[in-house]
């Protein structure tokens, strides 16, 4: 039997779960522990099939709209980490549903910023991807027409505001830092008085994971991003790897998704994971490579992370006796 070829694995750090994802998953699990099954969840709690399937097995029921929840239920309904339009909690209240809000606090920060700009009479631009649940939620914080979506640099070049001197912008939290910087620069060049966030809206986890990929992608033959196709931050990581010159940059939800022909002649491989992807899948993929190669593993770090977001009050441990 011939010896397995050597393969250098470069793990990107940080990778995987962020504080907002941990909070969202813990919210569902704590609700199941405290109230029992079922617990309804509006939209995927985070964009990861492995996580969602695991919660389904524990008794979570995922729906896209509140109308899918039985009228007579007393079970809790959890709003996903991506945030929801204001109409959703209002609808839940009108139906006397018991709701738990697992919206990431950094998304809530964007909602607050938009509300402040609206109160001050500013026309608001939202930099983001249409149809993404986070963008739908942010647009739904204010009356229709109060926020204009900007998706591309071309949009930023051509948009015509009502009053160029009374503008503000906010952004989706999971965008490409480079693409967003280009759009923001164009807006500031065209509208020097535009108001932006005091601290950028792209979240720390998105930024750190992209910076780690920027370090690793130029020095490996291939890079795998563990993540789901509908995960915005995971897709951006793959795009960053391609942009930094990595010859093979792929997105994979599980080891079974990998096309092994693409990795036959590589000698080095980078691995990262989107903010909603669990470390167990990284380990699964490394095990799959270990069956075919002799691995030599190292880690490249771009930042240290120690962020923590408290759970919704109703499911905090101290609320157990309530």
From Swiss-Prot:
One of its GO terms (biological process) is terpenoid biosynthetic process. GO terms for molecular function: 4 iron, 4 sulfur cluster binding; 4-hydroxy-3-methylbut-2-enyl diphosphate reductase activity; metal ion binding. It comes from the Bacteria. Its EC number is 1.17.7.4. Isopentenyl diphosphate binds at residues 47, 82, 132, 231-233, 276. Its cofactor is [4Fe-4S] cluster. CDD domains: lytB_ispH (cd13944). Binds 1 [4Fe-4S] cluster per subunit. InterPro entries: LytB/IspH. Pathway: Isoprenoid biosynthesis; dimethylallyl diphosphate biosynthesis; dimethylallyl diphosphate from (2E)-4-hydroxy-3-methylbutenyl diphosphate: step 1/1; Isoprenoid biosynthesis; isopentenyl diphosphate biosynthesis via DXP pathway; isopentenyl diphosphate from 1-deoxy-D-xylulose 5-phosphate: step 6/6. It catalyses: isopentenyl diphosphate + 2 oxidized [2Fe-2S]-[ferredoxin] + H2O = (2E)-4-hydroxy-3-methylbut-2-enyl diphosphate + 2 reduced [2Fe-2S]-[ferredoxin] + 2 H(+); dimethylallyl diphosphate + 2 oxidized [2Fe-2S]-[ferredoxin] + H2O = (2E)-4-hydroxy-3-methylbut-2-enyl diphosphate + 2 reduced [2Fe-2S]-[ferredoxin] + 2 H(+). (2E)-4-hydroxy-3-methylbut-2-enyl diphosphate binds at residues 47, 82, 132, 173, 231-233, 276. NCBIfam families: ispH_lytB, PRK01045.1-4. It comes from Bradyrhizobium diazoefficiens (strain JCM 10833 / BCRC 13528 / IAM 13628 / NBRC 14792 / USDA 110). The gene is ispH1. Disulfide bonds: none annotated. [4Fe-4S] cluster binds at residues 18, 104, 203. The active site is at 134 (proton donor). Gene3D superfamilies: 3.40.50.11270, 4-hydroxy-3-methylbut-2-enyl diphosphate reductase, catalytic domain (3.40.1010.20). This is 4-hydroxy-3-methylbut-2-enyl diphosphate reductase 1. Keywords: 4Fe-4S, Iron, Iron-sulfur, Isoprene biosynthesis, Metal-binding, Oxidoreductase. It is an enzyme of class 1 (oxidoreductase). Catalyzes the conversion of 1-hydroxy-2-methyl-2-(E)-butenyl 4-diphosphate (HMBPP) into a mixture of isopentenyl diphosphate (IPP) and dimethylallyl diphosphate (DMAPP). Acts in the terminal step of the DOXP/MEP pathway for isoprenoid precursor biosynthesis.
């Amino acid at each position: 039997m011939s010896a397995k070829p050597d393969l250098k694995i470069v793990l990107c750090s940080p990778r995987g779960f962020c504080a907002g994802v941990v909070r969202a998953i813990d919210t569902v699990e704590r609700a199941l522990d405290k109230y029992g099954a079922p617990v309804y969840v509006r939209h995927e709690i985070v964009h990861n099939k492995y996580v969602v399937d695991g919660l389904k097995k524990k008794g979570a029921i995922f729906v896209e709209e509140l109308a899918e929840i039985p009228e007579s239920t007393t079970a809790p309904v959890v709003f996903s980490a991506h945030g929801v339009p204001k109409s959703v909690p209002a609808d839940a209240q009108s139906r006397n549903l018991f709701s738990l809000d697992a919206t990431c606090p950094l998304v809530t920060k964007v909602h607050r910023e938009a509300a402040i700009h609206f109160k001050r009479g500013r026309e608001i631009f939202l930099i983001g991807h249409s149809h993404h649940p986070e963008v739908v939620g942010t647009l739904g914080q204010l009356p229709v027409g109060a926020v204009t979506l900007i998706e591309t640099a071309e949009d930023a070049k051509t948009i015509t505001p009502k009053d160029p001197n009374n503008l503000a912008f906010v952004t989706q939290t999971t965008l490409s830092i480079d693409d967003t910087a280009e759009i923001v620069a164009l807006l500031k060049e065209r509208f020097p008085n535009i108001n932006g966030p005091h601290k950028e809206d792209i979240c720390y986890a998105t930024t750190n994971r992209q910076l780690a990929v920027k370090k690793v992608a130029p020095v490996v033959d291939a890079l795998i991003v563990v993540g789901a196709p509908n995960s915005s931050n995971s897709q951006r990581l793959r795009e960053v790897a391609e942009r930094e010159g990595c010859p093979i940059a792929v997105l994979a939800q599980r080891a079974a998704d990998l096309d092994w022909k693409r990795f036959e002649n590589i000698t080095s491989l980078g691995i990262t994971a989107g903010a909603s992807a669990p470390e167990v899948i990284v380990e699964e993929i490394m095990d799959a490579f270990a069956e075919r190669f002799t691995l030599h593993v190292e880690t490249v770090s771009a930042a240290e992370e120690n962020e923590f977001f408290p759970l919704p009050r109703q499911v905090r441990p101290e609320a157990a006796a309530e």
